[in-house]
A protein has these predicted regions:
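Structural signature of WD-repeat beta-propellers
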Residues: 1, 45-46, 89, 96-97, ...
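A generic tandem-repeat structural signature
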Residues: 1-20
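WD40 beta-propeller blade core
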Residues: 6, 51, 102, 140-141
């Protein structure tokens, strides 16, 4: 992984831009999740970073740390983004391994709310909740507007859970 993002013209296949960031010494080597929304591309980067680029030019709009490296050794400081960021209304919601889950302002990257959690699976989001499994197999639901805890289910403890999917009144992992 060279930590490079490349934008191509959809009609011609010609390269339009390249953005490269320095990779941390250790990562989980998760594939970076990307989502295009309107005129931006949102990218989950190694090292627990979430970045918004202007799709036409590759120019950075903002970059934030969702996962903050902590610990005495390189191994303890490993943090990475889990899954693909999810855009809903004016929010982008994301989670990191050894970091946080949260929803951030789509235009500025400013946090609306964050909670400490560790997940490599990713999030599902609906109009009311953000759903995320932690790395111990518990599934959490947070209020999308405030980040307050709605519920927790730990019946799937110590299983490697997938990115949640929500539909109507159900959520599956």
């Amino acid at each position: 992984i060279d930590n490079r993002i490349v934008g191509y013209d959809a009609k011609t296949g010609q390269k339009k831009w390249t953005v490269q960031r320095t990779a941390p010494a250790l990562t989980l080597r998760l594939a970076p999740g990307m989502v295009i929304h309107d005129k931006d591309v949102l990218i989950a980067q190694p090292g627990g970073k979430l970045m918004s680029l202007i799709l036409a030019t590759g120019a950075p709009r903002w970059e934030i740390e969702v996962g903050v490296a902590r610990g005495a050794t390189e191994l303890e400081r490993v943090t990475d983004m889990g899954g693909t960021p999810v855009v809903i209304d004016d929010d982008v919601c994301a989670v990191s391994y050894q970091g946080r889950v949260g929803c951030f302002d789509l235009a500025t990257g400013s946090p609306r709310w964050t909670r400490e959690i560790s997940s490599e699976a990713g999030v599902a989001v609906d109009q009311r909740f953000v759903f995320v499994p932690d790395d111990k197999g518990a599934v959490f639901a947070y209020n999308r507007d405030s980040g307050t805890s709605a519920w927790k289910n730990d019946k799937l403890a110590y299983r490697r859970l997938s990115t949640p999917v929500s539909y109507g009144r159900a959520v599956a992992v």
